[in-house]
Amino acid sequence: MQKRAISSRFSEKAVSYEKYALVQKKMADHLSQMVTEITNENDVRSILEIGCGTGGLTRVIRSYFSAAHYEAVEIAQGMLEQAKNNLEQHGLICSFSQADAEEWVWEQQAKSKDLIVSGACFQWFARPAHTLRGLARILKPGAPLVFSTFGPDTFWELHDSFTNAHAILGEKGVRHGLEFLSARDWHEQLEQAGFTDIEISRKYERLTYPGVRDFLHAVKAVGASVSMEQGSGLGRRKLLAEMIRYYEQTYKRETGIPVTYEVIYVRAVSSRAVTFFK
């Protein structure tokens, strides 16, 4: 997926993001709790956040580690501006950089960070294994990486409905949206990147919307619909209509249609004896 398209779409939706990013807010709350449980604020002098979005997680972590230098990287300029305003309103200081983190990490000083955090960002990586090596490289030996991301069961009702819609229309099915890595995939890639003491947990979050179009509107409002946009014209409209019909006929209850998120939480420690090459 083109990084330019991702950056553009998230920038466009920066204002509406916080209203609709309900699961992402829950992820930020849990992630901040994980961070404060495993770290001593007096031992953390330099923090890096990957993909800060509008600054929800940034604000909480920055407040807790008030004496540390805090740097946040975000690919979407619109999101970055929202994050800056967010922190300024709370009197918090943070160094912000607009960049593609997958390239940016390799330009930073090795063994310079006491903590790296990231909420709901890693699923967008084009080269996760390569980027994890870069993150391990800039962490001090024994320093933690703590992040959350989405697992493959996310939106399973939607994917099932698309699969059946393709079949009903006599079409070959294609994936609509990102291919999420599993908890096992992340564990393997973290090990290969030189991380140790890896702890991974999964949690399912379920939201309910009045109808499928309301759900799709919410996805679009947080900028994530760029991962689902395939095809155009009459064929796409027919597919979308059939998908919605199947979804609501199969899954709708009195309260509305369910939408499932598989959330993966990860804690890992940078190895003390690994040499990193780009």
UniProtKB/Swiss-Prot annotation:
Pathway membership: Cofactor biosynthesis; biotin biosynthesis
Reactions the enzyme catalyzes: malonyl-[ACP] + S-adenosyl-L-methionine = malonyl-[ACP] methyl ester + S-adenosyl-L-homocysteine
Enzyme class: transferase
Alphabetized Pfam families for the sequence: Methyltransf_23
Family annotation (CDD domains): AdoMet_MTases (cd02440)
Any single GO BP term: methylation
Keyword field: Biotin biosynthesis, Methyltransferase, S-adenosyl-L-methionine, Transferase
Gene Ontology MF term list: carboxyl-O-methyltransferase activity; malonyl-CoA methyltransferase activity
EC id: 2.1.1.197
Similarity comment: family membership: Belongs to the methyltransferase superfamily.
Function of the molecule: Converts the free carboxyl group of a malonyl-thioester to its methyl ester by transfer of a methyl group from S-adenosyl-L-methionine (SAM). It allows to synthesize pimeloyl-ACP via the fatty acid synthetic pathway.
Protein name as catalogued: Malonyl-[acyl-carrier protein] O-methyltransferase
